[in-house]
Amino acid sequence: MPDILSQGGGRETGPWPRRVAAVAVLALVAVLIVHYLPQSRHRTARPARAAVTVTPPPAVSSAVSGDAGVVEEPDGITGRILSWPGGLRVPATGERPVWFWPATGQVVPIGGLPPQRSGYQFTRAAGGWAVQADPGTQAGCGSCAGPQRAVYFLADSGRSATRAGLADAVAPGVPGTLWLTSYPTDAAPHTAAGVAREVSIAGRQLGPQFRLPAGYLIEQGTSRGLLLVPVTSRAGKIADKLWDPAAPQASRTFDGVIAASATQIAWSPSCVARCRVQVLNLTTGRQASVELPAASSVANAAFSPNGSSLVIQVSFSDNTTNGARAVQLERVSLASGRLTTVPQTWVSSDALIGFGWPASSDNLVAEFSFTTKVQLTSWRPGASRLAIVVLRPQHSPASLVIGQHSS
């Protein structure tokens, strides 16, 4: 029976953006990046859910300095802050990917990845990252898959990436595995059926190849099959599909998937007034329902590395002419259903670049862009304040890898 997890009275939450980066790993799909101020840093674009009207809370002031103490600079997250954890590092993509230590500004090249003019795509996997060269622009056939590209695995604690194979697309699997999908060079992935194979992170093939349903791409390999997403959006909403190659007729669909791991799927079905987040544990079959307050919804989330919690981005319509919303990060304990606000994260939707766990630890990392600065935050559950650093262009990489997909 479903286990109903109620948020409780009166907490404010709201709509969030939906991930699209699974599509970005194919040559046919343009990588959706937008410039944000300052210093032309990049982020992956995230389409928003339908607006929900609510009364906006007080505006959030902005800013910070990278040292522990009281934030003094205008335009950013304000208040008392903590020092950045000394050992916490994040990868940065680009022509030559690097490891970046926000606490010190140290930058070290990631070994095993040759220089790539088009840059690299990073996809979060258990214990590390799947890394693949960005496809760039295909001459003569913009919708074709093009030549296959090398796939690498970069461990959270690794100094170098290890080659895992060649493919047109890569997706995370159960721990220690990746799923590689290939197409004929002249095929259009939005209509063609890709051929997928499971490999170890060292590149050893683990089983037979499977032909995917035409027009679908693997988002996540799970303990109960492959979570598939449409390669491109089409007229009308197409649900994601949990597909078992051995029993394709038994597929289950999910409307509005917001996060997935090897053992859990979270989704937020379309709603009008009272929205819910559903979480299915694929190992036990247990389904939980997290109720959001009235007039709020959600469109993006991330499971913690150990699977014990789900962080959701909640947003509110503020009825402004530019369509911006107030957003806030909330952590849901999947054991108790308790919802905890991540402190100091009430900002405009335009300010939140991304969030996730760039290492297998309890530290949730988020990136924010304000008018005069970009801030990187770290939060450990139970802490009453954030650790914050200001990312200055002359001392930090341009494209940090924060969320599930980055390029």
Please provide the spans of the model-predicted regions.
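Surface-exposed loop/turn elements that mediate protein-protein interactions on large endomembrane-trafficking
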Residues: A51-P74, A92-Q116, Q138-L166, A187-P213, ...
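Terminal targeting segments of Actinobacterial cell-envelope proteins
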Residues: M1-W16
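Hydrophobic beta-strand positions that form the internal "hydrophobic ladder"
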Residues: L88, W129-A130, T177-L178, L226-L227, ...
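Repeated scaffold domains used in trafficking and secretory/extracellular systems
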Residues: E73-I81, P114-A126, A164-G176, R211-R224, ...
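Residue-level marker for isolated small/hydroxyl-bearing positions within beta-strands
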Residues: P91, Q132, T181, L228-P230, ...
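Secretory targeting and sorting signals
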Residues: W16-L37
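C-terminal region of N-terminal signal peptides and the immediate post-cleavage residues
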Residues: V31-V60
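Loop/turn-rich, solvent-exposed surfaces of beta-rich toroidal or solenoidal domains
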Residues: A299-E330, I353-P358, A366
